Amino acid sequence: MHHHTRREFLWQTWVGSTLVCSIVEGWRDLLRAQDPPAPRYDLLVKGGRVIDPSQGLSAERDIAISGHNIAHVASAIPESEARQVLNASGKIVTPGLIDIHVHVYDGVAPLGIPADPTCVAKGVTTVVDAGSAGAHTFPGFRKYVINVVDTRVYALLNISVVGQSTLSTDNPYGELLDLRYANPKLAIRTIENNRDVILGVKIRLTRNIAGDHDLAALKLAREAADAVQLPLMVHIGGSYSPLKDILALLKKGDVITHSFRGGEGGILDDNGRILPEVRSAVARGVRLDIGHGAGSFSFDTAEKALRQDLLPGTISSDVHQFNINGPVPVA
């Protein structure tokens, strides 16, 4: 009987092991070749009507997403190419919506509501807070809201240093009843220090907010907006001064919010016709914003304006503490 030497034993063991490994690897390669390829996309939103004004698109499309990016948009993308498929048939699919008039300084402005549950969770990914904060309260707004929420929040700075922190259901006195609170110097400084998030200046001119010195306050807001070369948003309706005098101080790029409100100080004359001063303002580039709010929109005004070919430039919600849970009164 032949006894294997240690060298022969090691040689045979090595050859056998190598052969087994080669066979196993061969099977692995074969199985790997038969496996379906890994999905190209993380998520496929399938069959929805995609409305994307930036692309001039309003049609049924599939949208493939990889990571945080839109990877592909086509009329038909196979479901096998995505790890997860969301059936959007019968639904509208849009880019994140933008609302240019909200109030999200929760806990400081009585109107304020939490940004994320109201905005990004409902498909509104970018908002402009319209004057909740003034020069004295803006640092807190930036630190505790803008810098921490998932919603992308920009701001219009209130010309009043206290912002919208005074007026509430239990305290019917607005932020400009004392004209000394309108401080262009502080507004300009605050805007210059926060140019990345402040997009303009905001003023409210209702009687219980600006009193009988509304035009004086508006001129101070105009001064601040001009100094920083940013637009001015003006809350109209129920003011001491007539709308024509307010419009005379507005320029191209400025915004009238609550533009289709009913009642005193609106865009219609007593016969339901568009005021000529409104026509002139729009012609020189002043923009009309809906700013629906809790009582700042009138179907009657809107219908009369539309019949006279006057359209809003933007449709904003003016969402706040007193309309978030609805229903919202309309005239």
Where in this protein do the model-derived segments appear?
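Glycine-enriched alpha-helix->loop->beta-strand junction motifs that scaffold or abut catalytic
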Residues: 250-255, 282-287, 307-313
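Histidine-rich, glycine-flanked metal-binding segment
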Residues: 30, 35-44, 49-94
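Divalent metal-coordination and catalytic microenvironments
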Residues: 48, 68, 90, 101, ...
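Short catalytic-loop micro-motif centered on adjacent basic/acidic residues
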Residues: 126-130, 232-235, 288-292
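Histidine/acidic-residue-rich, glycine-tolerant segments that coordinate divalent metal ions
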Residues: 131-138, 145-275
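Metal-associated gating/positioning segment near the N- to mid-region
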Residues: 79, 83, 87-148
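His/Asp/Glu-enriched, well-ordered alpha-helical/loop segment
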Residues: 300-331
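N-terminal secretory signal peptides and thylakoid transit peptides that target proteins
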Residues: 1-18
